[in-house]
């Protein structure tokens, strides 16, 4: 199948595919550990349920399914040559706590639709029961990663890191909030921790990795455009910080005798905002914060908080961390507090491969030429000759997968820029455009691959 | 028994009594829900255990014991006239989380020793088995209150409020951190919530209430004095505050689109410190603080924190709360956040009764006259002619009991001013002086009472 042939398809097939994706997002949203909200973390019973459902949908789309040794759900559409490498398409099915229904999930379901649209059956000669296969020199594989958010064990990208072969056995001792280790959770899920390396793929097995994702910010909406090429994924570091002071009686301890850890941590959180907000493309967030012993009438002797620090460039991000560290020294010194930190995540910026940026751009161009768009209201509002390119401050599975293969990403417009929240949204029309653009991108890559 | 007769006792009896008190403080410290630390909250299994032990010690000292309908442990030494009112002596046996071993506890154990020292048996005529009785026109009753700290249900003074007849049935619905209501906890403890009013005492039943307590600050230590008369107990209000913003993705949400509840709450905590620290005898403390949903990669949409606000005078304290409220309006308005609060405790300042201040002062004077002190090292460092008088920024059971009777308090020196912390301390010598001063105070009151 070529890009030209895909363009000749009835545009309503993309809308039908998008309707199925939206309905399935709703169906997965009901699989949650928190009734009335969406929370689905790594190696939970909900994880097992969505994997089973995704596998069913993959098989229904003609894919050969398996769950790998890290709990990732995979679906393969092989090439004619069974030894040929694969292009991986996908995203993750886990969520943050009290999440929206599209982050990650929509990308997995769109990948299934794209593979369904692109597959070929050799039914001309051998009948309708012939297995589906990739029309390209490479196979197509849908990956539903098991952990991208890191909501349970603090460490993000566990699923894609296993695939990338960058697993660190120290992670087995990470604990969730209930004190269950990653090792215990894996065993309970039915995985063998000793075999996690079997999930790792070799670079030679892969042509690349393509992912569609909602934008987790307001940029496309502000520009009035439905789709964008992603240029790079933010570099990210995550820290757990501890401030130590002295627990004292709230009534009897005068201010000048206090060493209040909570106030030191409060100043630190505000310093992060003050320092980062004046920088370009640097974002620091304190998302967790707790004071101990946590009684109304005791001056807190300890405070713990998290810092998530992202930047477009590693060096810039590290320079800002140094600045924050110096500021913490000042604050804690002035308040006679001690502070220390543990880095729990460190991922360098991931630059999307030029070829994959090109094919995603071609996919968007092919999709948004006047007359071809599914959603008439969007027509003409895009700039097909010059697809928008965005930097992603949010992390994605590509950050891990980038260790073994080229990565490309497609962003879809997010009406309010809201993500990691129940109000997270994407329109049916934009998902239809996204499915088409991703399919076009894969077809362009197929054509490029054949030429090289 | 008169003050003069008490003064004729061998001073070593006070040291022996103090040794028993210190040993029992150590024994009670081992009854905790948190091994390695001291935590003993209202209506817990540990509460039941310390009540049983206190009752045993009370009986061993000749008292008639009972546990009242609010879980307070009481021990009575009746007067010759069984209808006579009683002077209540005591404090509380509950603790904050990760507490010291003296706050409250030492006052209960000292009261037992004082009653043991003062009691009379009519053994001259009727033999050794005659029951002990008060030598005064009033009975003596030791009260070990069940809840002063409020560590479990947020509301402090539950035990003494029941005794004061100021119980509010709305409190039954208060929840502990596990979601157990006060009603459920009472039932589980074996109490009948419908009968809590039976714990209430009438003003006519009481002569007054006297309590010995460690100072929860550094003032006596700084002055080099072992004991002080307490003039008043701080007025206190406690609030639970909620800040509401919007949970957003930590990577994708630019600073100008954020409504970060944690940063608003951090500013609020610092504002409390800034406002209160410039006032005389006003102390505000943020002891609890939590952010939600509490994930590293989500901008917090909600933050909850507590405020404990104390002052020597109610009006001054309320004026400062108004100032804090206006500051919160400013902060939250600027950050596009909402805030609301629930007041969980409001106690007016309690002024100790002039007569009880006088007898406590007499008790200290009688104790610290040169030659009578137990601990020679302290001798002469006090100023017996003019006992130190201190305001108590910390709350005490007298705040509740003050609703039905006169209150008097005696403070003992606290070497580092530390309280609500494992390092809380008081010396054996100061406890011995305290026991003597409290016994002398009761004897002086007995003499006063006879005169009137």
Task: Name these PLM-found stretches.
Chain A
Residues 15-18, 29-30, 181-231, 269-274, ...:
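Active-site-adjacent substrate-binding region
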Residues 135, 147-148, 152-314:
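Midchain, well-structured core segments that form catalytic/ion-binding scaffolds
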Residues 39-43, 285-294, 306-313, 338-358:
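A short beta-alpha structural unit
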Residues 231-233, 249, 253-278, 326, ...:
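His/Asp/Glu-rich mid-to-C-terminal helical/loop segments that flank catalytic regions of hydrolases
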Residues 21-24, 29, 87-91, 376, ...:
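Zn-dependent metallopeptidase/amidohydrolase metal-coordination segment
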Residues 2-44, 171, 343:
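N-terminal capping segment at the start of a domain
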């Amino acid at each position: 199948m070529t890009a030209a042939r895909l363009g000749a398809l009835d545009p309503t097939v993309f809308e039908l595919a998008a309707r199925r994706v939206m309905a399935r997002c709703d169906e997965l949203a009901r699989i949650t550990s928190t009734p009335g909200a969406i929370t689905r973390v790594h190696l939970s019973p909900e994880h097992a349920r969505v994997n089973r459902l995704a596998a069913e949908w993959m098989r229904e789309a003609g894919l050969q399914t398996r769950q790998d040794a890290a709990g990732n759900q995979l679906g393969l559409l092989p090439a004619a040559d069974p030894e040929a490498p694969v292009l991986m398409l996908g995203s993750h099915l886990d969520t943050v706590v009290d999440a929206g229904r599209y982050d990650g999930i929509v990308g997995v379901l769109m990948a299934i639709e794209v593979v369904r649209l692109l597959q070929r059956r050799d039914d001309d000669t051998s009948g309708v029961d012939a297995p589906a296969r990739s029309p390209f020199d490479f196979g197509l594989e849908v990956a539903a990663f098991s952990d991208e958010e890191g909501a349970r064990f603090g460490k993000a990208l566990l699923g894609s890191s296993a695939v990338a072969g960058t697993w660190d056995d120290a992670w087995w001792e990470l604990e969730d909030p209930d004190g269950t280790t990653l090792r215990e959770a894996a065993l309970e899920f039915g995985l063998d921790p000793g075999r996690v390396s079997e999930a790792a793929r070799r670079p030679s097995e892969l042509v690349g990795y393509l992912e569609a994702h909602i934008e987790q910010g307001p940029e496309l909406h502000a520009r009035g455009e439905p789709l964008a090429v992603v240029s790079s994924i933010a570099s990210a570091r995550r820290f757990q910080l501890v401030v130590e002071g002295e627990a004292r009686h709230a009534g009897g301890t005068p201010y000048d005798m206090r060493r209040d850890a909570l106030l030191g941590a409060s100043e630190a959180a505000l310093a992060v905002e003050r320092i980062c907000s004046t920088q370009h493309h640097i974002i620091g967030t304190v998302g967790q914060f707790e004071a101990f012993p946590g009684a109304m009438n005791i001056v807190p002797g300890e405070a713990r908080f998290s810092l998530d620090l992202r930047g477009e460039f590693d060096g810039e991000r590290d320079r800002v961390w140094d600045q924050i560290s110096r500021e913490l020294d000042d604050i804690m010194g002035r308040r006679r507090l001690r502070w220390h930190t543990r880095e729990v995540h460190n991922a360098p910026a991931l630059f999307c491969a030029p070829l994959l940026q090109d094919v995603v751009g071609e996919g968007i161009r092919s999709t948004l030429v006047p007359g071809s768009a599914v959603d008439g209201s969007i027509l003409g509002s895009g700039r097909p000759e010059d697809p928008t390119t965005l930097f992603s401050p949010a992390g994605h599975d590509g950050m891990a997968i980038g260790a073994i293969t080229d990565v490309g990403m497609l962003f879809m417009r997010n009406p309010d820029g809201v993500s990691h929240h129940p109000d997270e949204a994407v329109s049916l029309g934009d998902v239809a455009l996204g499915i088409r653009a991703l399919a076009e991108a894969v077809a362009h890559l197929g054509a490029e691959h054949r030429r090289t």
